């Protein structure tokens, strides 16, 4: 955890450039895409409730991969790995849990509180920010959680179908959050970046 959280001072120029481009990408999405995506989702699911199954049961279930389903998946890998003496499966489960704690539990939570962005369902616009005021839309915690797990799986199991499946499921978590009015597109993009970076960093550090 300490290694990942203290990584920025060790970044080289290329890594800082990449981070700058990522930040610009999030700002660009916020300015250009957030409103059209929100309007489209409202037309598709105007009365959608994120807490109960609705007309789109599929997205309701996919959203849970940003919380309990992915934890169950990691638990399954750990148990199966321990029973079958599969060190990679055990390491993947451990790295996945560590990445969730760092990406979703620490970085995302702290950023949410500091930024204080209102959610789409609050209907106050895309640029309503109250730092430390209670609003917590940016970034998406479900998405950072899901992408942290996807990144860990993809970095442990280097098969194309595994990578595609992992990131596809994580992406659908983001779609579900937008569908349910929980997040703007830029919230989801930022969460995906955080989760992916943290997952990759945790795996690389523990393999080194």
Please place each PLM-identified region on the residue numbering.
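N-terminal targeting leaders of membrane proteins
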Residues: 1-66, 70-84, 113-114, 120-136, ...
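Interfacial segments of alpha-helical transmembrane regions
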Residues: 15, 19-20, 82-107
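Hydrophobic alpha-helical transmembrane segments of multipass integral membrane proteins
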Residues: 24, 71-75, 106, 146-149, ...
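Alpha-helical transmembrane segments of multipass membrane proteins
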Residues: 25-26, 30, 34, 103-108, ...
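Extracellular loop and loop/strand-boundary signature of outer-membrane beta-barrel proteins
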Residues: 60, 87-90, 94-96, 134-136, ...
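Alpha-helical transmembrane segments of integral membrane proteins
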Residues: 61, 68, 72, 95-96, ...
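Small-polar-interrupted transmembrane alpha-helices in polytopic inner-membrane proteins
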Residues: 76, 97-114, 165-177
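Membrane-embedded catalytic cores of phosphoryl/pyrophosphoryl-handling enzymes
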Residues: 120-208
């Amino acid at each position: 955890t300490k290694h990942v959280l203290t990584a920025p001072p060790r970044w080289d120029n290329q890594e800082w450039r990449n981070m700058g481009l990522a930040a610009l990408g999030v700002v660009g999405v916020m300015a250009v895409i957030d409103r059209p995506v929100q309007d489209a989702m409202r037309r598709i699911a105007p009365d959608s409730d994120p807490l109960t199954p609705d007309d789109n049961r599929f997205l309701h279930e996919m959203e849970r991969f940003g919380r309990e389903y992915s934890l169950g998946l990691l638990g399954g890998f750990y148990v199966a790995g321990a029973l079958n003496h599969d060190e990679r499966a055990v390491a993947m489960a451990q790295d996945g849990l560590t990445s969730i704690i760092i990406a979703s539990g620490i970085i995302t939570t702290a950023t949410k509180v500091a930024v204080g962005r209102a959610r789409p369902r609050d209907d106050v616009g895309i640029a309503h920010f109250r730092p430390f005021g209670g609003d917590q839309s940016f970034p998406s915690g479900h998405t950072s959680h899901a992408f942290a797990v996807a990144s860990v799986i993809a970095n442990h199991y280097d098969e194309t179908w595994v990578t595609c499946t992992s990131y596809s499921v994580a992406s659908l978590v983001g779609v579900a959050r937008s569908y349910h009015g929980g997040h703007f597109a830029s919230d989801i993009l930022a969460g995906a970046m955080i989760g992916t970076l943290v997952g990759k960093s945790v795996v690389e550090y523990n393999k080194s």
